[in-house]
């Protein structure tokens, strides 16, 4: 898929030529899962799969929207006068949410837009298709209406849409990775301070393989919000005995010394993941900088174990992929990526072994689960941008 596909689709739907094309990537997180809302570090990167848009003006004061990913929905009109109406339960809620947040922040929409969207991110697979759409919309509206918003402002607008409009208490990682991505680099982001640095992802003879369970997951309907609430409860208990603003501020030793303050064993497990995952992320980013891929892979796998047993956000589909991935020749590490409860996992695989890896893991998954997983070799890409 490329920009030519969406310009052709635009003409078919709207009967005229598109004037602009845009792209926003998806993302994977190398390590640092469920730490972004706990004041910890994350280590994501944008990928070459993503969401494209072809855009043209119209004479109506309305956004006229079509997605090739949801063809049965057809063209949806959102008049400017309806921006602050309730959401409709459609993909267009993400467009409407971004538009209303930007309008509130001072954006001036001077004319209507026809927008044709098509993406090659599997919907609900944990590669941040919703955040990709949000950052795509933010880039379109910021560029075409001279909004003047900085990239980090667009990131925060996207988070606000998720939290206040869609109803998902997500952190900042997805929107940040998609808006700020750079080719062949991952971003070590401290979500507590929003300080970040780009680090080259040099895998030598290895590649990152994305493994899609093809079990669709819904953030708002999953236990994502429950996990965040559990971490907040654990933090509140710790704060009765020690001075700490977020779980991400604690070292492993500090946490172990103060677990007596958390009298619920489930909450201890949830908080332990947040604290130890943050430290794993720092160690992993250093290992990657040092070229120590063996240590990096071990930390990635340790993250997966913690997500399965302390945070309990995997399930049989993800566990089957990761367990079988780690049995294969040429694999340095593997774990689920994203929020969990279905979606995708990643594995670091020697490029010479990728074909056998996909065959073997795919066969084991099909035998255990009863349907196919899908596999993609990830290219680390630039962030959201205008293409023409």
Curated annotation (Swiss-Prot):
The keyword Chaperone does not apply. Its main location: cytoplasm. One of its GO terms (biological process) is galactose metabolic process. It comes from the Bacteria. Pathway: Carbohydrate metabolism; galactose metabolism. Mg(2+) binds at residues 130, 162. The active site is at residue 174. It is found in: Cytoplasm. Pfam families: GalKase_gal_bdg, GHMP_kinases_C, GHMP_kinases_N. Gene3D superfamilies: 3.30.230.10, GHMP kinase, C-terminal domain. PROSITE patterns: GALACTOKINASE (PS00106), GHMP_KINASES_ATP (PS00627). GO terms for molecular function: ATP binding; galactokinase activity; magnesium ion binding. ATP binds at residues 67, 124-130. Its EC number is 2.7.1.6. The record marks 27 as: Transition state stabilizer. One of its GO terms (cellular component) is cytosol. Belongs to the GHMP kinase family. GalK subfamily. Catalyzes the transfer of the gamma-phosphate of ATP to D-galactose to form alpha-D-galactose-1-phosphate (Gal-1-P). NCBIfam families: gal_kin, PRK05322.1. This is Galactokinase.
């Amino acid at each position: 898929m490329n920009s030519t596909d969406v310009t052709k689709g635009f003409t078919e739907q709207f009967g005229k030529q598109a004037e602009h094309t845009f792209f926003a990537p998806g993302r994977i997180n190398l390590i640092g899962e469920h730490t972004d809302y706990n004041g910890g570090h994350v280590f994501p990167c944008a990928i070459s799969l993503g969401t494209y848009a072809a855009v043209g003006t119209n004479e109506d004061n309305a956004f006229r929207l079509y997605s090739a990913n949801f063809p049965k929905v057809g063209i949806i009109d959102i008049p400017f006068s309806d921006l602050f109406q309730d959401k409709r339960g459609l993909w267009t809620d993400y467009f409407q949410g971004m538009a209303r947040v930007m309008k509130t922040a001072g954006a001036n929409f001077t004319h209507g837009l026809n927008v044709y969207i098509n993406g090659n991110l599997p919907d609900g697979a944990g590669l941040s298709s919703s955040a990709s759409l949000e950052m795509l919309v933010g880039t379109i509206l910021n560029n075409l209406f001279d909004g003047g918003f900085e990239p980090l402002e667009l990131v925060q607008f996207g988070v606000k849409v998720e939290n206040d409009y869609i109803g998902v208490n997500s952190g900042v990682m997805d929107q940040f990775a998609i808006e700020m991505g750079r080719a062949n680099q991952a971003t070590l982001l401290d979500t507590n301070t929003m300080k970040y640095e780009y680090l080259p992802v040099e895998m030598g003879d290895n590649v990152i393989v994305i493994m899609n369970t093809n079990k669709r997951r819904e953030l708002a309907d999953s236990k994502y919000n429950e996990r965040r609430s559990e971490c907040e409860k654990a933090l509140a208990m710790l704060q009765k005995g020690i001075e700490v603003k977020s779980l991400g501020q604690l070292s492993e030793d500090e946490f172990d010394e103060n677990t007596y303050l958390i009298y619920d064993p489930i909450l201890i497990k949830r908080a332990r993941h947040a604290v130890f995952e943050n430290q794993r992320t720092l160690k992993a980013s250093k290992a990657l900088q040092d070229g120590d891929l063996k240590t990096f892979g071990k930390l990635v796998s340790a993250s997966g174990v913690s997500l399965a047993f302390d945070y309990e956000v995997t399930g049989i589909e993800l566990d089957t992929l990761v367990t079988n991935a780690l049995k294969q020749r040429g694999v340095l590490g593997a774990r689920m990526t994203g929020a969990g409860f279905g979606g995708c996992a990643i594995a670091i695989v020697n490029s010479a072994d990728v074909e056998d890896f996909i065959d073997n893991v795919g066969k084991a998954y099909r035998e255990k689960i009863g349907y196919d997983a899908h596999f993609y070799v990830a290219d680390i890409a630039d962030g959201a941008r205008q293409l023409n």
